[in-house]
Amino acid sequence: MQRIALSDKLELSRIVYGMWRIGDDADTSPAHVQAKIEACLAQGITTMDQADIYGGYTAEAILGGGLKAAPGLRDKIEIVTKCGIVAPAGRHSSARVKHYDTTAGHINVSVEASLRDMGTDHVDLLLIHRPDPLIDAEETGKALDALVASGKVKAVGVSNFRPWDFSLLQSAMSNRLVTNQIEMSLLATDTFTNGDLAYLQEKRVSPMAWSPLGGGSLFSGAYGGTMAALQRIGKEQGVDATAVAIAWLLRHPAKIVPVLGTNNLERIRTAADALRVTMDRQTWFELYTLAIGKEVA
């Protein structure tokens, strides 16, 4: 598996395993979590993507159970997690309304809870989960810088930020924001033309892509033309349609890092084959044309 450097301190696997659905598994035992991580490692996928809010604030503890059951496993992986969304559930059950909180106090409490739940002394990458209309960039930036200085966080970034949100927070920090995790797939193509990817390329920031398979909708039967093309291309290259859909993102020069959000171990294995796919410009545009439903102008 190829690796990608987001900074001089942080490398991720070229494909990341997203754990937002890990609590949906019928089996969330430490042994099953351990087996899932080891299945990822067998494919070269070493980076696990989390967030405090996943599973109603339970997903990080599920991961922690697996890591506790297998001493040494933590040293083989990178952990990405996120904070900043407060929902009336779990440890925030007293919240009256779902909201965002990017204050220093909330960020620090969230990180401590994440470290405790996952049983680790640091996270490799911390992301602010969504842009906060009430963000005090100076306060948030200082809090993130302090976490990096403390060693509790190796690197910081954001998720779902538009260029102006990214620029504002970066202007208030000494550490570099190393990524922006945004929705990208053959079913979510706006980022290719709305300036998001252009901005990140200008700043030499590699984006992460959540829901790179459209949350599984790509395989629902509703996108027959796109699926037929993916299957044809996959057959030509000896891979599954899943691998072709991931390879479509990898082909972009922005150096997109897809985050797989599946609980299907076989889909994880086939997605790793994306790195074997050769995709020329015309093939990329064939899929893009099917995705947007019309020829480019």
Swiss-Prot record:
GO molecular function terms noted in the UniProt entry: oxidoreductase activity
GO annotations of cellular component type: cytosol
Annotated catalytic residues: Y54
Pfam families hit by this protein: Aldo_ket_red
Residues bound to NADP(+): W20, R21, D49, S159, N160, Q181, S211, L213, G215, G261, T262, N263, R267
Binding residues annotated for D-glucose, in chain numbering: Y54, K98, H129, R130
EC number(s) stated in the UniProt entry for this protein: 1.1.1.432
PROSITE patterns: ALDOKETO_REDUCTASE_2 (PS00062)
InterPro entries for the chain: AKR (IPR020471), AKR_Detox_Biosynth (IPR050523), Aldo/ket_reductase_CS (IPR018170), NADP_OxRdtase_dom (IPR023210), NADP_OxRdtase_dom_sf (IPR036812)
Reaction it catalyzes: D-glucose + NADP(+) = 6-dehydro-D-glucose + NADPH + H(+)
PANTHER family: NADH-SPECIFIC METHYLGLYOXAL REDUCTASE-RELATED (PTHR43364), OXIDOREDUCTASE YDHF (PTHR43364:SF1)
Protein function: Part of the sulfoquinovose monooxygenase (sulfo-SMO) pathway, a D-sulfoquinovose degradation pathway that enables the complete utilization of all carbons within sulfoquinovose (SQ) with concomitant production of inorganic sulfite. Catalyzes the NADP-dependent reduction of 6-dehydro-D-glucose to D-glucose. Cannot use NADH.
Subunit-level organization: Homotrimer.
Protein name per UniProt: 6-dehydroglucose reductase
Native source species: Agrobacterium fabrum (strain C58 / ATCC 33970) (Agrobacterium tumefaciens (strain C58))
The organism's taxonomic lineage, starting at the top: Bacteria, Pseudomonadati, Pseudomonadota, Alphaproteobacteria, Hyphomicrobiales
